[in-house]
């Protein structure tokens, strides 16, 4: 169909240059992060009435917000209200559980600088009140996960503070920790290890 102007001339649509979509490099399909895997695991435990464990929210003080559109708000500036303690907490078989999740690309050790003093103090307090505190450590290059009781983390932290090494060797983690199995549902079955280590 030909379209014409009132003066009879033909309308020629201005040819617009063909835009090739810019490919965005995404790494989302390379694998889930440890946090995502644990969140999925905890969702599985909750929906199957196995345990009630949640990720703790990070307490933030929002200072500046921009509104580029009416329905969108973009936080431009925020500060931590207080130091966060550990990543996850909840209840399993009537016991309070509290744990931190850490990843490392190191092959032979886990650096203690990944912990902060307030996290160590928090784990000590959990243990003092008969709670269960532990750390899940992932060696990403080997795709291996270990559950390590907080008493060992505290001992290694104290060793560091008395002039000892500033990391935990992988051999020490293998010796004192428990290897976690990964699957489909749940993704990281840490409850099975809790049953063996704390409830047997």
Swiss-Prot record:
Name under which the protein is recorded: Holliday junction resolvase RecU
Main function: Endonuclease that resolves Holliday junction intermediates in genetic recombination. Cleaves mobile four-strand junctions by introducing symmetrical nicks in paired strands. Promotes annealing of linear ssDNA with homologous dsDNA. Required for DNA repair, homologous recombination and chromosome segregation.
Key words, A-Z: Cytoplasm, DNA damage, DNA recombination, DNA repair, Endonuclease, Hydrolase, Magnesium, Metal-binding, Nuclease
Site-annotated residues for Transition state stabilizer: 102
Gene that this sequence comes from: recU
Localisation per UniProt entry: Cytoplasm
Recorded catalytic activity of this chain's protein: Endonucleolytic cleavage at a junction such as a reciprocal single-stranded crossover between two homologous DNA duplexes (Holliday junction)
UniProt KW DNA repair keyword: yes
Entry annotated with the keyword Nucleus: no
HAMAP family recorded: RecU
Entries under Gene3D superfamilies matching the protein: 3.40.1350.10
Taxonomic lineage of the native organism: Bacteria, Bacillati, Bacillota, Bacilli, Bacillales
Cofactor or coenzyme needed: Mg(2+)
EC number: 3.1.21.10
GO biological process: chromosome segregation; DNA recombination; DNA repair
Binding of Mg(2+), residues: 85, 87, 100, 119
Any GO MF annotation of the entry: endonuclease activity
Database matches in InterPro entries: Resolv_RecU, Restrct_endonuc-II-like, tRNA_endonuc-like_dom_sf
One GO CC term on file: cytoplasm
Family indicated by similarity: Belongs to the RecU family.
The species this protein was found in: Bacillus thuringiensis (strain Al Hakam)
Region named Disordered: 1-25
Cofactor note: Binds 1 Mg(2+) ion per subunit.
Pfam families to which the protein is assigned, alphabetical: RecU (PF03838)
């Amino acid at each position: 169909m030909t379209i014409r102007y009132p003066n009879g001339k033909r309308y020629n649509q201005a040819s617009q240059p063909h835009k090739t979509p810019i490919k965005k490099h995404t790494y989302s399909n390379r694998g889930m992060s440890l946090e995502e895997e644990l969140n999925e695991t905890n969702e599985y435990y909750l929906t199957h009435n196995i345990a009630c464990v949640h990720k703790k929210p990070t307490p933030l003080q929002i200072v500046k917000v921009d509104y580029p559109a009416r329905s969108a708000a973009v936080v431009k500036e925020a500060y931590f209200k207080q130091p966060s303690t550990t990543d996850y907490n909840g209840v399993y078989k009537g016991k309070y559980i509290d744990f931190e999740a850490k990843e490392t690309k190191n092959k032979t050790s886990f650096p203690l600088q990944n912990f902060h003093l307030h996290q160590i103090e928090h784990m000590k307090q959990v243990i003092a009140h008969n709670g269960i505190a532990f750390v899940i450590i992932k060696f990403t290059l080997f795709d291996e996960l270990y559950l390590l009781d907080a008493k060992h983390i505290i001992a290694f932290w104290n060793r560091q503070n008395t002039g000892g090494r500033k990391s935990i060797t992988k051999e020490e983690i293998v010796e004192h920790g428990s290897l976690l199995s990964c699957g489909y549902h749940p993704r990281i079955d840490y409850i099975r290890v809790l049953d063996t280590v704390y409830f047997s």
